[in-house]
Amino acid sequence: MTVAQTIRSRIMAQGAGKRVRRAQIGLIYCAVQLESGSTGVAFTFPAQRSGQPCGAGLSGQGNLAGRSAGQLIEHLGSEELVSSALGMAASNAVIAECFADPHALGGDILDHLDIREGDRICMVGCFLPVLERLGNLAVEVTTVDQVAKPGAEPAERVERLLPESQVAIITGTSIINNTIDDILRLAAGCREVAVLGPSTPLLADAFRDFQVRCLSGIRVDDPDAVFRIIGEGGGFRFFKAVSYTHLRAHET
């Protein structure tokens, strides 16, 4: 199974019994809140979805509130990116309510990775705060991204860079657009593989067969604040009402 299929299979039974209180699709992120208050977010790929028809899939239906979370989760991995993102956000909300891991860790993601002097690190997706902190270490860092960014290599370079690396730091958004499975195959020789970002599902069990060592995501502490930021087109750097949460996927 793919990563998206594995996540769906692990949580669908719980998701079918949870109702959506509200859902919101912003410019950069979407959010789903359950009746319990548990909330998840996911990236909506604003730069990549311009060729997709307006109102395609779940995003054009206008009646997400009141549905079962399972109805959204089943769209995780859909070719329609916003529908897949809503499926990821609903998955994260269900995981936060039903699968909270007692082994979750706080602090800085770099505190939980086995990074050694001289390591080659390939970052798939550009996380500027992490990149800045890596700059203080005696390592070689290369970033690849689908969107052209200063200092980032084109996405196709990942086929050469990842197999040459000891550490892979992979954006959780790659689950949404179905690129993570190929990326993980390329990272098979890496000593340390981490999946990072607000979209990342904190479900260690779903990654045990995919050599992912660390999951780094968020817990939404103030849903109203997060919905307001997303509704106003804000991105991750404005997410203040969240807690950064990390799991060692093979040690729980």
Stretch-by-stretch model annotation:
Residues V130-R160:
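Histidine/lysine/aspartate-rich catalytic loop segments that bind and position anionic ligands
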Residues K18-E79:
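Long amphipathic alpha-helical segments
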Residues T245-T252:
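Conserved small/polar residues in nucleotide/adenosyl-binding loops
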Residues R120-M123:
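Conserved class I S-adenosyl-L-methionine
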Residues F99-D114:
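A short, well-structured juxtamembrane/interface segment
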Residues S165:
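An anion/phosphate-binding loop that grips the pyrophosphate of nucleotide cofactors and donors
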Residues T173-F239:
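Accessory, usually C-terminal, subdomains that scaffold auxiliary metal cofactors
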Residues M1-R21:
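Short, Gly/Pro- and small/polar-rich lid/capping loops
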